[in-house]
Structure formats: C-alpha cells, structure tokens
Amino acid sequence: ELDVLYLVDNSNVDNSKFFLNDKFEYIPLLKNTGIAHALNVGAKKALDSNYKYLLTMDQDSKFESDALKNMKNIIDNDIDKDTVGIYSPFHKTAISDPVPSELFTSPLVVMTSGNIINLDIYKCVEGFKEWMFIDCVDFEYGLNIRKHGYTIKQINTVFLDHELGNYEIKYFLNKKIFCDNHSALRRYYIVRNSFYLYDLYHDDFPDYCEAVKRQAKQSFFYATVFEKH
C-alpha cells in the first residue's frame, strides 16, 4: 500500500545493511535528535518526492489485516479531505475507550502512530516543533492544525494495535491508577511539554489545556508515590 517507506533511524548505529530494498529509504541520523526532528526528516523527504500524504508509524504499533488499505480507500472517497490535517485509525490499547459507532469522529488530538498527515497542511503549520524533542509533540501538532482551521478525523473502522510500554495498574482509595514507569528524563519531558502546551494553546483550547496541566501534575504524583525508581 506504500510507494516508499522512509526508515528514520535515530540510534547511534548505521543499520543500512539491513535495509537493502528499492522500496525502503533508510535515513540514519546517528544520534537521538528527538521524535519531532525524525518526523520532520520523513515529511521533508516525502515533500521532496512530491507526495501529498505521509503515514507516520512508531516501532510499537501495527495495523490489523487490510486496515491500511481500507484507510486509504476511505480517505480517497472523503469529500472533505483537503481540509483534514490528520486521518487517524482507532488506537487499540490496554486502556482505550470503546469503539465509537460512527465512521468518523473528530478528537481534538491523536497519537502519532498510524496517522496519515496531509503534507500541504503540514507545510502551512511549519511541521513538528523540534525543541519539544519527545512527548506532546503529536498533541501540539494536532492543536496547531486545529488553530489554523483544519480538522482531525479518526476512522473508527480502521484499527491500530498500539503497545503502551511498561505500564502497571495499581489502586489508590479504590481508584484504578495507571502507572507508565517512565525514566526520570522522560518524566521531565512529559511534565515540561505539558506546561508548554498550556502556555501555547490555553487561549484557544482552555478546557483541554487545563486537563493537560492537571494530568501532568497527577502523573508526577503517581510516579513519585507508586512507581519504582
């Protein structure tokens, strides 16, 4: 279903010998420059090759059978596609909500993996913010395209299996607590970038930004009290 696959490798090792295929374009960065930079590298490669759409994937996700083909067919037949900045599948995780009954829903933000982004709109919003490095990069991009008047469509008949990593479920005052067990550095980026989102978009999306701020404080508390260090 893909014309070309860009493999952006942000490890410090050149793994090109494993990707000798005409449909692969392997791009070694030879250091971890952050998820936002890696996404921009792939997007600019696609733009240089005159592609209109880019599928973004994480290493911990996979589409269910024929899902990508179905997603492409739905997009091709969507009369609103020129104003849709992101088409997203339904992300199936250990903690995901029930699948909506509608074909399309319009979440305010979506996770990166499995998205098909409109590259004309990507250029309009000037891509992903590289100074964020990791965490909230995808949410910032979603808010940015919405601030510019574009939309996000989640296709609820297309499923992506997404692993959440080393999470645990614990209980506090009869309440279920999800602990993600991130490193201290990763926790720093989560909290820092959550507050950046608040500063950048509170005027446009106040309810969401207040929730992000609360969640950042809550996750820091859970990490301090419940997670192993």
Label each residue range with its predicted role.
Residues 2-28:
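Acidic donor-binding segment of Leloir-type glycosyltransferases
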Residues 66-99:
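Conserved donor NDP-sugar-binding/catalytic core segment of glycosyltransferases
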Residues 40, 65-76, 122, 139:
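Short alpha-helix within the catalytic core of nucleotide-sugar-dependent glycosyltransferases
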Residues 121, 125, 131-164:
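A short, conserved alpha-helix in the catalytic core of glycosyltransferases
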Residues 112-126:
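Conserved nucleotide-sugar donor-binding
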Residues 51-60:
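Short beta-strand-to-loop acidic/aromatic patch adjacent to the donor-nucleotide binding site
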Residues 199-229:
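Non-catalytic, C-terminal membrane-associated alpha-helical segments of glycosyltransferases
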Residues 29-46:
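Glycine-rich, basic loop-to-helix element that forms the pyrophosphate-binding segment
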